Every structure is written in structure tokens, then in C-alpha cells.
Design a protein with these regions (language model features):
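Domain-exit/linker segments immediately C-terminal to small folded modules
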Residues: 2-174
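Long, contiguous all-alpha helical interaction modules
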Residues: 102-353
Length: 353
């Protein structure tokens, strides 16, 4: 097989005795639909589907595990990136069994999608290899799936083939994946802190609005996960407490004026303030202002050494990621009204796409 007729180095050769195995190999792969958000908040067309290729050591044992994939509901066959597809496949195969009983040592994930220079083909656009995935990595991903699972969005589409006096509309169920789970899976598969790079999900107002869907799941995630450092957990709790006081004050002021509390504007102000920080000095100034607006903070009073340790450490991006994680996972005063406003705008944009 030669992928490019003009480039000899792209020629692939295999001995005849492997023909039968190669012929049936696609039947042992796992396939996922990808929904990956770009930084502008729109779906990335370069990664639309993923093929998970297992590295099989025992075909009979793997065949038993593969049955779990075959009976998986369609809602679980969508992923948010390479690592998410790979770990989702492994979680599906493993179920309650030990990793040693799967008959595989690892797997490769290949993505396919559209590229600007070729509208007619769906070429390979990315790949990643997984070897010897640790049980604790899969345990963390299992928690991420539990808290940030796929959701089903029902869309109305016009049916050009419809006749008569009917509306000519059909209902389409679309499985929408979690961008946050995609980030978490990339981090834990690479041995990084699960929240690292969280600021990438807040680079634009549109992207931040989409992340609003993850609030309930993120709150559950930060509450249930075993943190690597207790100072990280205390820092997020301090952020939650500061937001709770700020939203409570806004609600009280709005009630006196008989107005709607501007929770959405305050959320955007906090987001842009944290995202404007480009070095340790500006971030510390922003966090100092953030906490000063948060009134009396019991977490700061009791655990100020741990919170301060996060703020003054050399890795200032870590403090920003944790602060934005706290903002995204806040669940308390004003969150119901804020959630309705953010989700209403995000749902309309999803339906347009």
C-alpha cells in the first residue's frame, strides 16, 4: 500500500502470512465520535473521529473484554480528544475486572477529520500511544467520567424530504462531550496534575460559557477527588468562599434597588481579571483584589499559610489554574441564576452549529 504515489517512503509492506490478521484487525478496534472544542469555542473539525487500536497479547481474553464495548450505549461512544477516547475505551473494556485480565498491554489512538487544504478527504490528524496505564490513572479518569459524563442534546432540524402540511422537522439526538474531561484525561495520562492548563478553557467568553455546563460536575469532582496537596484543595475552597460573599453582596444590593443581580457581569469580570494576569506579580495583585472583595473568609483565616503558599510559589500558572477551577466549580449563592443565563446563550449557539 502506498499512501502517496509520488513519495516512495510512504509505501507500506507486510508479509503474506499477516494478511488474514490485517484483514480482520479493524473488527477488534474501538471507534469513538469526537467533539473537541477549539479556543474560539467552536467544534474542531480536524478531530471528528477516533480509532482506538489495542495492543493485544491474548486474543481470547481480549475477545471476552471486547463484548463490553459491543453492548455500550451510544451515549458513551463519544469523546473529547485523543486521551479521552483512549481512556474511555480502557474503562469500557475493564469494567470491574483487573487490568491483567484484558489481554492487552496498551493501545494507540488515531484521530481523523477535515483539513483546510483537502475538503474531499478525511485524513489522519493526530495520534497517541498508551503503555502500562497505572490503576490510579484509570481510577481518576473513572471519577472524571462519573462527574463529567456525556450529555444528550435534542436538536430540531428541517427535513427537506417532508411533504404535506407538517412542519417538516426531525428531532436529532446529539451526544455532547465534556471539554473539561478532555483536559483532565490529557493531564492524567501524561502524569500531570489533573487541573493543569485549566486556563486554556477560559481563553474566550464563548468558551467559558460552554464550560458553564460543567459546574455541577466540577463541583463534584473537586469535592470527591483525592488531591495531591491539601493546599490545592484549601485554595479552591477559599476561592469558593470569596465568590459566595461577593454574589451575596450583589444580591443584597440588587434587592434594595429592586433590580436583577448582575451575576453574569461579575462572573465575566472575575474571569477576565484572572486571564489578564501574565506573570507572578500581576496574578498576585489580582488574587489580592479578589480576596479583598470577598469579605470575611473563614478558609483564609484558618488555613492562610496553605493558601498563601499557592499564591507566592514560583509556578504562578498553577495558582491561576486553581483560581479559575474554583470559579468554574463554584456552587452556592447566585449560581442558579447565573447558570440559567449562561446555559441559555450556550444552548442557542450549539443549536446553530
Amino acid at each position: 500500500v502506498q499512501r502517496h504515489s509520488e513519495i516512495a517512503s510512504t509505501c507500506l509492506e507486510e508479509p503474506p502470512e499477516r494478511y488474514l490478521c490485517l484483514h480482520f484487525a479493524p473488527m477488534a478496534c474501538l471507534y469513538y465520535r469526537l467533539s473537541l472544542l477549539a479556543r474560539d469555542g467552536k467544534w474542531d473539525k480536524r478531530k471528528r473521529a477516533a480509532v482506538v487500536i489495542p495492543h493485544i497479547t491474548n486474543l481470547r481474553t481480549y475477545a471476552d473484554a471486547f463484548q463490553r464495548y459491543l453492548v455500550s450505549p451510544m451515549g458513551r461512544l463519544s469523546a473529547s480528544g485523543l486521551a479521552d477516547a483512549g481512556l474511555s475505551a480502557l474503562l469500557c473494556l475493564k469494567a470491574e475486572e483487573s487490568m491483567d485480565t484484558l489481554g492487552i498491554t496498551g493501545f494507540s489512538v488515531i484521530t481523523y477529520g477535515k483539513v483546510p487544504w483537502d475538503k474531499n478527504q478525511t485524513p489522519r490528524t493526530g495520534s497517541i500511544d498508551f503503555q502500562d496505564v497505572r490503576p490510579e490513572t484509570l481510577d481518576r479518569f473513572s471519577l472524571a467520567w462519573k462527574c463529567l459524563g456525556n450529555r444528550t442534546l435534542i436538536l430540531q432540524q428541517k427535513d427537506p424530504a417532508a411533504k404535506g402540511n407538517g412542519k417538516g422537522e426531525t428531532l436529532l439526538a446529539r451526544s455532547v462531550t465534556s471539554p473539561v474531561r478532555g483536559l483532565i484525561s490529557e493531564n492524567i495520562s501524561a502524569g500531570k496534575p489533573w487541573y493543569q492548563g485549566f486556563s486554556a478553557l477560559f481563553t474566550s467568553k464563548e468558551l467559558a460559557r460552554r464550560i458553564s455546563y460543567e459546574r455541577e460536575g466540577l463541583f463534584a469532582m473537586v469535592s470527591e477527588i483525592v488531591w495531591d496537596l491539601s493546599s490545592e484543595e484549601k485554595f479552591v475552597e477559599a476561592i469558593h468562599q470569596a465568590i459566595r460573599f461577593r454574589f451575596g453582596k450583589l444580591a443584597s444590593q440588587a434587592k434594595e434597588r429592586n433590580e436583577r443581580p448582575p451575576f453574569d457581569r461579575e462572573f465575566e469580570r472575575m474571569r477576565t481579571g484572572l486571564m489578564r494576569a501574565k506573570n507572578a506579580q500581576t496574578l498576585r495583585a489580582e488574587l489580592a483584589d479578589f480576596f479583598s472583595r470577598g469579605g470575611i473568609n473563614p478558609v483564609l483565616q484558618e488555613d492562610w499559610r496553605q493558601v498563601l503558599g499557592i499564591m507566592v510559589q514560583p509556578d504562578w500558572q498553577k495558582a491561576r489554574d486553581l483560581a479559575l477551577l474554583g470559579l468554574a466549580s463554584y456552587k452556592g449563592k447566585g449560581v442558579t441564576e447565573l447558570q440559567k443565563e449562561l446555559e441559555a446563550e450556550t444552548t442557542s449557539s450549539e443549536e446553530e452549529e
